[in-house]
Amino acid sequence: MNMSKAEAFWQLTRMNRPIGSLLLLWPTLWALFLAADGLPDWHVLIVFVLGVVFMRSAGCVINDFADRKVDGHVKRTANRPLPSGLISSKEALSLFAVLVVCSFLLVLTMNTLTIMLSGIGIVLAIAYPFMKRVTYLPQFVLGLAFSWAIPMAYAAESNQVPPEAWLLFVINALWTIAYDTQYAMVDRDDDVKIGIKSTAILFGRYDKTIIGLLQLSVLALLIVLGSQLALSGIYYWGILAAAGFFVYQQWLIKGREREACFKAFLNNNYVGGLIFIAISASVLI
C-alpha cells in the first residue's frame, strides 16, 4: 500500500479531522461522570473513549460509501477518497466491518446490558447516511446515533439506565440537530441540486430561528438536569458560558455564508468541552 493509499484511508476515517470524534466524545464523558457521580471506572472510560474513535470512524466510512455517487457533485466533498477513486467500495465496506468488529470487541468487556444496547447503536450508525435520501430529518437520526453512547455509558458504569440518562439523551439529541443543521447549511445549495435532504433545506428561511430554539431548549434542559441532580454552582457557570457560545454561533450564521456556518459548527466543540468541565467539576469537587 503506497503512501497515497494510506492517506486516503486516513481521510476516509476522518482521523485527520477530529471534530466529529470530539462532538461524540463530550456527551459520552458527561454521561460517564454523572453515572459515576465522580471519576468513572478506568476500564470503562478507556473502552468508551476508544469506542468513540472506532465508531465515529466507522460512521464516516459508511457515510462516504452511501454518498459515493453524489459526493463528486458537491464542492466540499468532490475530492474524498471514494468519489476520487483512491479507495474502492469493497475496500470501504471492509474497513467499516473491521472498525465495527473492533468496537464490538471492546463492548464485550462490558456488562450484559451495555452489550444489548450496543446493537441499537450499530443500527443507528448504519441507518443515518441513508436517511438523507428518504427524509428531510436525517439530523434527527444523527441526534439519536450521537446520543446512544449516553444510555450505554450509564449501563456500563451503573448497570442501569435511570431517567436522568434519558434526559441527557434528549439534551444531546437536540444539540446534535442544532449543530448538524449548521453543518448542513454549508452544503445546502449543492444538496438541493442533487436531491439530498436535510433540516437546513426543510427549515428554509426559519433555519436560524429553529437552531436558536433548539439551543434554548438545550440550555433549559441542562438547567433542569442540574436541578434534579443537585449539581453545584460551578455547573451553572458552565451553562452560562455555553449560552455565550450559542449567541456567538447565531452571530456567525446570520448571513448564512458557507465558511461562517462551518465555523459555527466547529464552535460546538467548545460548548461540549465547557459542559464537560462544568459537570466534572461539579461531581469531583
From Swiss-Prot:
Annotated gene: ubiA
Protein name per Swiss-Prot or TrEMBL: 4-hydroxybenzoate octaprenyltransferase
Pathway: Cofactor biosynthesis; ubiquinone biosynthesis
Known role: Catalyzes the prenylation of para-hydroxybenzoate (PHB) with an all-trans polyprenyl group. Mediates the second step in the final reaction sequence of ubiquinone-8 (UQ-8) biosynthesis, which is the condensation of the polyisoprenoid side chain with PHB, generating the first membrane-bound Q intermediate 3-octaprenyl-4-hydroxybenzoate.
CDD domains in alphabetical order: PT_UbiA_COQ2
Keyword Plastid: no
Molecular-function GO term, any one: 4-hydroxybenzoate polyprenyltransferase activity
Gene Ontology BP term (one): ubiquinone biosynthetic process
Cross-referenced Gene3D superfamilies: UbiA prenyltransferase (1.20.120.1780)
Main localisation: membrane
Membrane disposition: Multi-pass membrane protein
Organism: Aliivibrio fischeri (strain ATCC 700601 / ES114)
Compartments reported by the entry: Cell inner membrane
The keyword NAD is annotated on this UniProt entry: no
Cofactors required: Mg(2+)
Catalysed conversion reaction: all-trans-octaprenyl diphosphate + 4-hydroxybenzoate = 4-hydroxy-3-(all-trans-octaprenyl)benzoate + diphosphate
Keywords (A to Z) from UniProt: Cell inner membrane, Cell membrane, Magnesium, Membrane, Transferase, Transmembrane, Transmembrane helix, Ubiquinone biosynthesis
Cellular component, GO annotation: plasma membrane
UniProt family annotation: Belongs to the UbiA prenyltransferase family.
Upper classification of the organism: Bacteria, Pseudomonadati, Pseudomonadota, Gammaproteobacteria, Vibrionales
